[in-house]
């Protein structure tokens, strides 16, 4: 390792894999030799190895090739696909799935038993509750006027048991209410009430049918 990392895993596949700084890896993890663990973020690039904070990875996690930046925390039984990225100061709860090419930017807070499918993008500051499903290539945003005006981060909040379909787009600063269902390809420009369906471009809302008014089947 690089620095003062701590590992108690029996199944760590290290090879030449760099583990940066004070990273802490839990028990019974599988970590691929091409993963970057505790990679220094911009403010740490010039620090010595022992000064890099490192990241935390919970017990029984499966980490395939990708990057977990320093100061990120992944809960127990995290599973990833390939080429994922979790940036600094982001916290992810227990039992989450991060699919191939998923990007979770800095300062995000993700709950327990979430499932983010291939290519999903989660921008800076996003707050996600428990049992949230985000489909392939869904895109959350946090800046209404990118590079045209001074950057104003407007994070999105996604409450418990929300499902977001593939290729959906959520505009900055919105709240997606508990149990809401966002249809594939929808462009959401307004807050979505709890237990409502949003579909279309721009999305329009209707109440969910009774058979969909129940928690997501994640973490079972």
How would you label these PLM feature ranges?
Residues 49, 152-153, 210:
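Short, solvent-exposed loop/turn segments at secondary-structure boundaries
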Residues 42:
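Extended basic-aromatic, gly/pro-enriched interface segments that bind polyanionic ligands
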Residues 15, 20-21, 27, 32-33, ...:
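Left-handed beta-helix
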Residues 194-218:
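Conserved beta-strand-loop-alpha-helix hinge in the C-terminal portion
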């Amino acid at each position: 390792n690089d620095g003062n990392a701590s590992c108690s895993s029996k199944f760590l596949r290290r090879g030449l894999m760099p583990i940066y700084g004070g990273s802490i890896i839990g028990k019974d993890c599988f970590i691929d030799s091409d993963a970057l663990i505790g990679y220094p973020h911009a403010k740490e690039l010039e620090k010595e190895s022992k000064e890099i904070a490192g990241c935390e990875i919970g017990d029984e996690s499966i980490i395939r090739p990708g990057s977990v930046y320093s100061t990120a925390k992944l809960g127990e039984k995290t599973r990833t696909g390939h080429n994922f990225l979790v940036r600094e100061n982001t916290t992810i709860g227990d039992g989450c799935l991060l699919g191939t090419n998923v990007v979770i930017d800095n300062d995000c807070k993700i709950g327990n038993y979430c499932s983010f499918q291939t290519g999903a993008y989660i921008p800076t500051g996003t707050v996600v509750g428990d049992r949230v499903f985000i489909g392939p290539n869904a895109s959350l945003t946090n800046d209404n006027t990118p590079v045209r005006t001074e950057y104003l981060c407007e994070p999105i909040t996604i409450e418990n048991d929300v499902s977001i379909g593939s290729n959906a787009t959520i505009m900055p600063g919105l709240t997606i209410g508990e149990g809401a269902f966002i249809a594939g390809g929808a462009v959401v420009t307004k807050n979505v009430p709890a237990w409502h369906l949003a579909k279309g471009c721009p999305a329009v809302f209707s109440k969910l049918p009774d058979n969909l008014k129940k928690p997501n089947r994640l973490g079972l």
